[in-house]
Amino acid sequence: MFGMRKSLRATYDEALARVPEALKSEGFGVLTEIDIQSTLKQKLGVDFRRYKILGACNPPFAHEALETDLAAGLLLPCNVVVYEGDDRRAVVMAVDPTQTVAATGNPKLGELAEAVKEKLTRALSRLE
C-alpha cells in the first residue's frame, strides 16, 4: 500500500482541526488544502463525501531532499487525506514516502523518506 491509514473516533470536522496540530508536533506545516467535495461539485456537478487533501511539508527534510536531487520537488509536499467515512467518523491517510521515493532509485532520498515516514507515523498515532 502506498499510504498509511487510521480510522478515528473523531468526526470529520474534529479531525480537520486536529490533523494540522499532530503534523506540527512532528515539524510539518500544511501548505495547501484541497477540498475535493467542493471541487467535484463545482467542476462536475457530482456529490462526493467530505474529503480534503492537505499538502504537508517538513522544511528541513524538503530542503535536504531538494539539495540531494532537484527532481525531488515532484514528490513534495507529502499528501495527507482527511475524509468522512461511511460511519460519519473521520479517516486520515498519509502518503508513504518510502513508496513514492522508491521509484527514484536514489539511496539518499530513500534514507530521508524513511525518516519522514517515521514522523508521519508518529503524527498519525497522536490522533484518536
Feature map (PLM): residue ranges:
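Terminal, regulation- and interaction-focused segments at domain boundaries
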Residues: M1-E26, S125
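Short glycine-enriched loop/turn motifs at secondary-structure junctions
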Residues: M1-F2, K24, V46-R49, G85
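Conserved active-site and cofactor/substrate-binding residues in soluble primary-metabolism enzymes
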Residues: E14, D35, E111, A115
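Short glycine-/small-residue-rich flexible loop motifs, especially phosphate/cofactor-binding loops
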Residues: P20, Q37-S38, T121
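Compact, glycine-rich, soluble single-domain proteins
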Residues: G29, D35-V81
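Beta-strand/loop substructures that line and gate deep hydrophobic ligand-binding cavities in soluble
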Residues: N79-G105
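Well-ordered alpha/beta subsegment
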Residues: A103-E128
